[in-house]
Swiss-Prot record:
The keyword NAD applies. GO terms for molecular function: NADH dehydrogenase (ubiquinone) activity; NADH:ubiquinone reductase (non-electrogenic) activity; quinone binding. One of its GO terms (cellular component) is plasma membrane. One of its GO terms (biological process) is ATP synthesis coupled electron transport. It comes from Escherichia coli O81 (strain ED1a). It catalyses: a quinone + NADH + 5 H(+)(in) = a quinol + NAD(+) + 4 H(+)(out). NDH-1 shuttles electrons from NADH, via FMN and iron-sulfur (Fe-S) centers, to quinones in the respiratory chain. The immediate electron acceptor for the enzyme in this species is believed to be ubiquinone. Couples the redox reaction to proton translocation (for every two electrons transferred, four hydrogen ions are translocated across the cytoplasmic membrane), and thus conserves the redox energy in a proton gradient. Its EC number is 7.1.1.-. This is NADH-quinone oxidoreductase subunit N. Keywords: Cell inner membrane, Cell membrane, Membrane, NAD, Quinone, Translocase, Transmembrane, Transmembrane helix, Transport, Ubiquinone.
Length: 485
């Protein structure tokens, strides 16, 4: 296989992030300088984002049998890069108060971003597995980065052991699919999965095991048990990456797999996915009701959001509107999560010790940091799906797709789940405006809005509001980002 200049242009984001990994690694070996390595990482991620314009000019193509670069890949690559950029930005002040080695943090984020980009472009079960491992392995180190805190170390061990088990399920499932079909390419699987082949026991067992592995990575019920503990134990910037880049990249590749290989045509698989979606929506929201730790609350909330997205995935065979719904919902979820976790990161930095994740830490925040409290309120309203926010547009799309596909009991679950979610999101928002305690335990720096993390949080809030009122530009971008068929 010959690589042409056109192919290299299509792979620019992957190549730039890979080059940044090498440069940061050499920089660490030469001389440890926190500011230099953070700057190099941010420049590399920004350059990869800018390179997407050149990728768009090159057009859609199969670069290798494992990778397909098209509008769909560009959208999800962009979202992964934005989440990685925000993670590095939030991490800088947090690492300023960190006594151990700081520079490796950026290296791990960049390697995980490489995995996310590979997943966004994956067109083969081999690249799907490589991408998932490339995004998971750095996260083992990132989750336990504050290893002197017992909770962070415990979260890292839990995540490592359970993730390894999930990967083995995924790999075994792929082996069974290959044994029955004789191919691992998404497109080839799509051609071979007709004529009742989807009812073959070996194939059903293979896809069932793959659902277990992918369900763990996406923290869907009943494979979700690691989520609240890991979100709570991980440093706030790492929780940001876990909730955004990791979920978006993996859900994107699952969408492509279901689109090319019509796995959803099997009634058995559709029923299993519908039960998982229903359980994730209801259980995720119910468990979040009693949480007083904001990171655990957002962890349970992410379970329910993936349940909502699963409704659109089940309805994928009904038309392009499902693709549109997932794209709009994920963009809304990305910016809302970046804003919410960004506020937690700002409140936690550059303090030593555990993050400011107790709900009590945010009590009365409005009276001394009014803009930060307003940002957090907007994020909570968007995650709850209140009109005039981007979260509402995404949820409306999911409901419309569910109705179009006649998934009535899942539509009912979305409505009930949203009603339950409204309670705990508003509980966080209301606590911001209560009387502040005489001695607040944590507070954001007085100049937070001039820091890089503060600017990211403010831009996220602005986009959530502007695109919530005028979503047409986003809808146009998502419509352009359709996979090459």
């Amino acid at each position: 296989m010959t690589i042409t200049p056109q192919n290299l242009i299509a792979l620019l984001p992957l190549l730039i992030v890979g080059l940044t990994v090498v440069v940061v690694m050499l920089s660490i070996a030469w001389r440890r300088n926190h500011f230099l390595n953070a700057t190099l990482s941010v420049i590399g991620l920004n350059a990869a984002l800018v390179s997407l314009w050149f990728v768009g000019q090159a057009g859609a193509m199969d670069v290798t049998p494992l990778m397909r670069v098209d509008g769909f890949a560009m959208l999800y690559t962009g979202l992964v890069l934005l989440a990685s950029l925000a993670t590095c930005t939030f991490a800088y002040p947090w690492l300023e108060g960190y006594n151990d080695n700081k520079d490796e943090f950026y290296l791990l984020v960049l390697i995980a971003a490489l995995g996310g980009i590979l997943l966004a472009n994956a067109n083969h079960l081999a690249s799907l597995f490589l991408g998932i491992e490339l995004i998971s392995l750095p996260l083992f180190g990132l989750v336990g980065y504050a290893f002197r805190q017992k909770r962070s170390l415990e979260a890292s061990i839990k995540y490592t052991i359970l993730s390894a088990a999930a990967s083995s399920f995924l790999l075994f499932g792929m082996a069974l699919v290959y044994a029955q079909s004789g191919d691992l390419s998404f497109v080839a699987l799509g051609k071979k999965l007709g004529d009742g082949m989807l009812n073959e026991p070996l194939l059903l067992a293979g896809f069932g095991l793959m659902i277990v592995g992918l369900g763990f990575k996406l923290s869907l019920v009943p494979f979700h048990l690691w989520t609240p503990d890991v979100y709570q134990g991980a440093p706030a910037p790492v929780s940001t990456f876990l909730a955004t880049a990791s979920k978006i990249a993996i859900f994107g590749v699952v969408m492509r797999l279901f689109l090319y290989a019509p796995v959803g045509d099997s009634e058995a698989i559709r029923v299993v996915l519908a039960i998982i979606a229903f359980a994730s929506i209801i259980f995720g929201n119910l468990m979040a009701l009693s949480q007083t730790n904001i990171k655990r609350l957002l962890g349970y909330s992410s379970i329910s959001h993936l349940g909502y997205l699963l409704v659109a995935l089940i309805a994928l065979q009904t038309g392009e509107m499902s693709m549109e719904a997932v794209g709009v919902y994920l963009v809304g979820y990305l910016f809302s999560s970046l804003g919410a976790f960004g506020v937690v990161s700002l409140m936690s930095s550059p303090y030593r010790g555990p993050d400011a994740d107790s709900l009590f830490s945010y009590r009365g925040l409005f009276w001394h940091r009014p803009i930060l409290a307003a940002v957090m309120t907007v994020m909570m309203l968007s995650l709850a799906g209140i009109p005039m926010t981007l979260g509402f547009i995404g949820k409306f799309y999911v409901l419309a797709v569910g109705v179009q596909a006649h998934l009535w009991w899942l539509v009912g679950a979305v409505v009930v789940g949203s009603a339950i979610g409204l309670y705990y999101y508003l509980r966080v928002a209301v606590s911001l405006y209560l009387h502040a305690p005489e001695q607040p335990g944590r507070d954001a720096p007085s100049n937070w809005q001039y820091s890089a993390g503060g600017i990211v949080v403010l831009i996220s809030a602005l986009l959530v509001l502007v695109l919530g009122v005028w979503p047409q530009p986003l809808i146009s971008i998502v419509r352009l980002a359709m996979p090459l068929m």
